Design a protein with these regions (language model features):
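Bacterial N-terminal signal peptides that target proteins for export
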Residues: 2-11
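C-terminal motif of bacterial Sec signal peptides marking the signal peptidase cleavage site
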Residues: 18-21
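Compositionally biased intrinsically disordered regions enriched in Thr/Gly
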Residues: 23-313
């Protein structure tokens, strides 16, 4: 009887061992893939500004010849509507600075009367972006007609176009480029940067970058960069004389570049037309106590050193 029970135990034990041996072993690769998948799930998704520029739908009179006016306005269409809205308004502001049109009267301009039927398809469209741009296009065409009436052979042109410059990170940037020639001695150009926080969905201004009570320190650093620029560009024998005509001022038009904070200036802001669109660069190593930590470049992690084999002894 005891022998029979012992035999039964041995049989059951042998069966359990056999079944365990038949189970498939876990593939190490599968385990590694699961670990990678877990890490990827835990890593936060970085927000990215994606978009394209699309031309504004304006109507211009038919024109043939080499002196036809060129009017091009493009707008940003992105995955962040709050940015599109801000850029749209800045485009309209830029057009107003270039053309400086007044509010249209009841009759409208000559060009407006010619294209009214095809450009505006009802009163409900008057406040749309394209309808507002059309007003500036009408003023632009009227200017062209006036110049041609004076027997001018000038070909006037106007371009306003945004571009995504920095799509990821703490600060994303859209640049708005504009250029125009309206029949004067020379053309004009401008470059404005608009910076945004995608997480908070807000525009970032220069003062947002600064630590408390550090604006004066930034102005001092920018003024030193200005002095260096004046002398390096050979604009004057000394900075004091130069500032009699072109005094320094701090620009609010900025870009966080790879090497430092870039302050962008427009034509005639800190120099004559010949200097174009000057910019001052303040290196990040000078801004450690001026900019908030989140706006400074993060130090790159040092690669792990390779193990060194030692001989036994």
């Amino acid at each position: 009887m005891l022998s029979s029970k012992a035999s039964l135990r041995l049989t059951l034990l042998a069966s359990a061992i056999f079944l365990a041996a038949c189970q498939p072993k876990a593939d190490p690769k599968d385990s590694q893939e699961q670990q990678k998948s877990t890490v990827q799930e835990q890593k936060p998704v970085e927000l990215t500004l994606k978009g394209e520029t699309i031309p504004s739908k304006v109507v211009l009179p038919d024109c043939d010849g080499k002196t036809c006016p060129e009017f091009t306005v493009e707008r940003l269409q992105s995955n962040f509507p709050f940015i599109d809205k801000i850029i749209d308004q800045q485009i309209l502001n830029t057009l107003n600075q270039i053309l400086e049109i007044a509010e249209p009267d009841a009759k409208g301009t000559q060009a407006e009367q010619k294209v009214e039927a095809s450009a505006v398809a009802g009163a409900e469209q008057k406040n749309t972006f394209d309808a507002q741009v059309q007003r500036y296009a009408n003023s632009f065409i009227d200017l062209d007609n006036e110049l041609k009436a004076l027997s001018s052979n000038h070909q006037i042109n106007l371009l306003v176009k945004p571009k995504i410059l920095q799509a990821q990170g703490k600060v994303v940037t859209v640049v708005l480029n504009s250029s125009s020639y309206l029949g004067g001695a020379h053309g004009s150009a401008a470059q404005h940067y608009y910076n945004f926080d995608l997480k908070e969905q807000k525009q970032i201004k220069l003062e947002d970058l600064l630590r408390p009570q550090q604006k004066a320190a930034l102005e001092k650093l920018a003024h030193e960069a200005f002095k260096t620029w004046v002398m390096d560009s050979k604009l004057a024998d000394n900075v004091a004389d130069y500032e009699q005509a072109w005094p320094f001022k701090l620009s609010n038009n900025f870009l966080l570049g790879e090497q430092g904070l870039i302050l962008q200036y427009g034509e005639y802001e800190i120099g004559p037309y010949v200097v174009g669109l000057p910019r001052l660069v303040i290196p990040y190593d000078q801004l450690q106590d001026v900019l908030k930590e989140e706006y400074l470049p993060q130090p790159k992690a040092k690669p792990a050193s390779a193990p060194v084999a030692k001989s036994a002894g």
